Amino acid sequence: MRTLVLMPTYNEVSVLESSIEQVLAQRLDLEVLIIDDNSPDGTGGLAEELSLKHPQVSVLHRDRKQGLGKAYIAGFSWAIEQGFDFVVQMDADGSHRPSDLEKLKSQAHSNRLVIGSRWTPGGRVENWPWFRQVISKAGNFYARKMLGSPVKDMTAGFRCYPTEVLKSFPLDKVQAQGYGFQVEMTLLCQDFGVE
C-alpha cells in the first residue's frame, strides 16, 4: 500500500530538513510531499534540495500563501492523481512525532480515518504552553458538543486518510482553514460513513 505524507510549509526553513530526515529515518515504505506556499524565507528552495537528495520526497510549489486547508486539498488531489492508497497529514514544524507514523499507518484501512489524538489515553503534547493546551481542549469540547461528534480530537492535524475515501469527498467545496479544516474534514468523514 503506497502511503504519502503531506507536509504543508510556510516559513519552515529552520526546521524542515530535520523534520524530513526524522520521517525518512523511520524506514517505512512511504513518500513525502512538501507543499510550500511561496515561503519568503527560502523554504521552497530547501524543499527542492531535499527532493534532489531524497528520491522519495517531492515538492508542490504554490504561487502564494493560500492557507493550511487549501494546501492539504492540493496534496490530497496530488496523492489521488499519483495513485497513493493512503495520505498522512503531518506538520512540518516537528510537532508530530515521526516515531508515531508506524502506529498511525498500522491502523489504516480502506474505510477508516485514523487520528493521532493528543487527548486520548496514550496521546500527549510536547512543547506546548499550558494555555495552548487549554485552548485546544476547550475548542475540541465545544466542537464535539455543538456538532454532536463522538470524535475526541477534532482539531488534531496528525491523520491518515484512505485515498478511496478522499475521492468520494467534494474536496472543491471544503472552505475551512486552520483548525476549522480538521473539523470540517472530520464531519465529512462522518457524513460519508467513514469509521
Where are these regions (language model features)?
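Cell-envelope/extracellular polymer assembly enzymes that use nucleotide-activated donors
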Residues: R2-L4, E31, E184
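Short beta-strand/loop segment that forms part of the nucleotide-sugar
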Residues: M7, L30-S39, L60-H61, M90
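Short, well-formed alpha-helical segments that are part of the catalytic scaffolds
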Residues: E12-A25
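Conserved short acidic donor-positioning loop in nucleotide-sugar-dependent glycosyltransferases
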Residues: V23, D37-N38, Q66, G75
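A conserved acidic beta->alpha catalytic loop
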Residues: D36-G45, G94
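Acceptor/aglycone-binding surface of glycosyltransferases and processive sugar-polymer synthases
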Residues: R62-E81, F86, P98-Y179
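Short, intrinsically disordered, charge-balanced linker/junction segments flanking boundaries
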Residues: L104, F192-E195
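Short active-site alpha-helical segment characteristic of glycosyltransferases
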Residues: F181-L188
